[in-house]
Amino acid sequence: MTATPSRSLSYPFSHGVCLALFASLLLAGCASWNPWKQREKSARDQEKYGYTADTRIKKLSERSKVVKSESTQSQIEFTQDLVRMMLEEHDPRVRSKILETAAEYDTSAATAICTGALQDPDEMVRIRACDVWGKRGGDDAVQLLATRFQTDAELDVRLRALKMLGELKDKQAIPVLARALEDSDPAVQYRAVASLKKVSGRDLGNDVNVWREWAADPEGKKAEWSIAEGFRQLF
């Protein structure tokens, strides 16, 4: 009969020891973490370095929502502030957000940001700028995207510029896309083909040589191209 009390006493004792050991390990592992000290450090860092990138992005979104419902003059002043922010911002994620925000406004300052972002030192921002101009359109869009394709050192940026030229569906882009067919990189050639399909409204397949022939005389041989496209749709 003595065995039962022994077991009932040993269980809570061992359980209590385990909890004590776990607590001591937990406290030892978290000795360097103190929520109050962390808050104080965050406050000091914010005072010294400013808001974190995520906070700056959040505040920018909140401010833009308010400004959209305000007067034209308020929007002009806001986008002028965005120019200053763009020039001072060191984080490319935040610059991308500034760019996307500016693209929602029709002011000279907003246009300046969208144009300047095409030459941003960060590849990600330049790609976003191509997206912006693909949606923004306008008289300058083809030339700006063409220049980015022809001059950028990064393949991903060049490919995005070609893609956005297709999204514009502007026939002024055909000469640029035709030159892209001569690029030594197959990825560039096939991106040019995809964009030519959108700009021309035709589907001549994926043969680069066929598109080269078409691009040499887009307005000629209309009947022949139409017949070829008809067979392609059937088969």
Residue ranges and their predicted role:
Residues 51-52, 90-91, 121-122, 153-154, ...:
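Short inter-helical turns and helix N-cap capping residues of alpha-solenoid HEAT/ARM repeat scaffolds
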Residues 53-65:
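HEAT-repeat alpha-solenoid elements in large eukaryotic scaffold proteins
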Residues 33-47, 69-87, 107-119, 138-151, ...:
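Amphipathic alpha-helical scaffolding segments comprising HEAT/armadillo-like alpha-solenoid repeats
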Residues 198-235:
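Terminal, low-structured helical/coil segments at or just beyond the last alpha-helical repeat
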Residues 62, 101-104, 132, 139, ...:
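Core register positions within helices of long alpha-helical scaffolds
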